[in-house]
Design a protein with these regions (language model features):
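A conserved regulatory-domain signal marking ACT and ACT-like small-molecule sensing domains
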Residues: 1-116
Length: 116
C-alpha cells in the first residue's frame, strides 16, 4: 500500500543523504521525495512517498525518528492532505505546438509557462 511520510529535519548539509541512506540500507523504496524549507528557516520539511504494509511503514517511521537531524516524523496517509504533482517538459516552440498546448489547458491546475 502507498504511504506518505512527513519528516521535519534540521536544515543541515547531509540530512537528505542520511534519510536516503536509511532507505537504501534497509532496501526500502522511495517512490517520490520532496524537500523544501519550512516556516522555521532552520528546518526543512521532507515528504516521502513509499509503499509497504503497516509493519514496514511503522519500522521506517521508527528508524527515521532515530536519525540525528530528524525533529519530527509523521505518517500522513490517513490524515487530511492535498496532493499535487508537477512535470517539466521541454518542447520545441512553434505556433502549431503553442495552439496544441493551449487546447490542453483544461483547468486551473494546468499552468503552462514559456521560457524566454
Amino acid at each position: 500500500m502507498r504511504h506518505i511520510i512527513s519528516v521535519l529535519l534540521e536544515n543541515e548539509s547531509g540530512a537528505l543523504s542520511r534519510v536516503a541512506g536509511l532507505f537504501s540500507a534497509r532496501s526500502f523504496n522511495i517512490e517520490s521525495l520532496s524537500v523544501a524549507p519550512s516556516e522555521d528557516l532552520t528546518a526543512s520539511r521532507m515528504t516521502i512517498v513509499t509503499s509497504g504494509n503497516d509493519a514496514v511503514i511503522e519500522q521506517i517511521v521508527k528508524q527515521l525518528d532515530k536519525l540525528v537531524d530528524v525533529i519530527e516524523v509523521s505518517e500522513i496517509t490517513s490524515s487530511d492532505h492535498i496532493e499535487r504533482e508537477i512535470v517539466f517538459v521541454k518542447i520545441k516552440d512553434s505556433d502549431t505546438e503553442n495552439e496544441n498546448l493551449k487546447s490542453l489547458k483544461t483547468n486551473e491546475f494546468l499552468k503552462i509557462h514559456k521560457a524566454e
